[in-house]
Amino acid sequence: MAKDIRVRYAPSPTGLLHIGNARTALFNYLYARHHGGTFIIRIEDTDRKRHVEDGERSQLDNLRWLGIDWDESPETHENYRQSERLPLYQKYIDQLLAEGKAYKSYVTEEELAAERERQEAAGETPRYINEFLGMTEEEKAAYIAEREAAGIIPTVRLAVNESGIYKWHDIVKGDIEFEGGNIGGDWVIQKRDGYPTYNFAVVVDDHDMQISHVIRGDDHIANTPKQLMVYEALGWEAPEFGHMTLITNSETGKKLSKRDTNTLQFIEDYRKKGYLPEAVFNFIALLGWNPGGEDEIFSREELIKLFDENRLSKSPAAFDQKKLDWMSNDYIKHADFDKVFALCKPFLEEAGRLTDKAEKLVELYKPQMTAAEEIVPLTDLFFEDFPELTAAEKEVMAGETVPTVLEAFKAKLEAMSDDEFVTENIFSQIKAVQKETGIKGKNLFMPIRIAVSGEMHGPELPETIFLLGREKSIKHIDQVLATL
């Protein structure tokens, strides 16, 4: 690539880091790192009504948790927040006003609403009608004087070239174009409070920071022609644009909505539940991008090496919670034990289960976990009363040979000394029951597992019995035998 690659993620500090915004940050990060470019964080905080205290810190903390780093940000550079850049925006607004490419608009919000209502009632597409249309210079001056005398604070609008064609080659979607006449008329570039609107400020920022590529969600496609108008008015070269497809709910097929409460949509949720960040990073990287091939598990370094913007999907990306959980389980299974135990420790501590067996329990259930918080319900067997058996479990325990198996195994446990009660010997005693009774396979192992653990499936049975202890294992078997 000929020009220096400079990309940015520019969040608003209006809340937690959503999975869609995390994807935008991640794809820009991968693009920059793959091409040896620069990844920038810029904070778009001009919407003061939606500003959330600690919103910026939350965004940055969650990006760091994911494993995303950056080269420039408000932490290291001055004026990387829009609220710190107001004089720069004013400079270019004044320039456009002086050149006649923008003008002050005194129409009130009430008048705009009334006109919009009239247009909708007439079946017209709502658009701003230039309030100075048909006025002489004298009439225009009188109108402005009257409005200013009434205390009306103007906005500033960009004069739109209605006959202009605004087109670009989108990195993801190919060629896109809009007609200037379909934008909705002259649009506001500066609000009454003096703050610039998004579509003006973002152009000034991207130009000033020499952004080469803008990669974002396709909900920004409609913003792009307006931004191209600003580039044109100021005589600047526009960056390349790429608009990623929306993320859909895999179950409904509809756009992922914050009202989908069954889906974890904020990175903070995954942190709190004890997911490994590498798993979430890997999963998000495959939301709308495919490296080719059958593999789906990739390290951050592998994703950086493989990332190719030409493989960004034109089809919606399905957010599949089950796939994320499968991926997370794979990461936990292959992670260092110390790393997984460190994740589980706070949950065990809060539940009062940080005993001398804690490490062994985490080791036992590590292959089953999707997230560290699951260590608490998984270890209920060791800290709670014996659970009520399900209908399926009761059906297994109604088998003809079950009492024989349980009585025989109970006798083996009772005959073992404390020194003999170790995992290897427990397995040997199960095999001894098989040899003595002739009962094997599921008819042997399933009744013992259900009688000891109250579940049909679980981790290694001998290790479970060892950690549960001989007395408690015998007690559980007696409880079940009493119901047969």
Curated annotation (Swiss-Prot):
UniProt xrefs under InterPro entries: aa-tRNA-synth_I_cd-bd, aa-tRNA-synth_I_codon-bd_sub2, aa-tRNA-synth_I_CS, aa_tRNA-synth_I_cd-bd_sf, Glu-tRNA-ligase_bac/mito, Glu/Gln-tRNA-synth, Glu/Gln-tRNA-synth_Ib_cat-dom, GluQ/Sye
Q: What is its EC number?
A: 6.1.1.17
The lineage's top-level taxon is Bacteria
Q: Where is this motif: 'HIGH' region?
A: 11-21
Placement of sequence motif 'KMSKS' region: 255-259
> What does the entry list under GO cellular component?
cytosol
Chief localisation class: cytoplasm
Q: Kindly give the PROSITE patterns that the UniProt entry links to this protein.
A: AA_TRNA_LIGASE_I
What is this protein for, i.e. what is its function?
Catalyzes the attachment of glutamate to tRNA(Glu) in a two-step reaction: glutamate is first activated by ATP to form Glu-AMP and then transferred to the acceptor end of tRNA(Glu).
Under PANTHER family, the record lists: GLUTAMATE--TRNA LIGASE, GLUTAMATE--TRNA LIGASE, MITOCHONDRIAL-RELATED
**Similarity comment text for this entry:** Belongs to the class-I aminoacyl-tRNA synthetase family. Glutamate--tRNA ligase type 1 subfamily.
User: What does the subunit comment say?
Assistant: Monomer.
Q: Protein name, please?
A: Glutamate--tRNA ligase
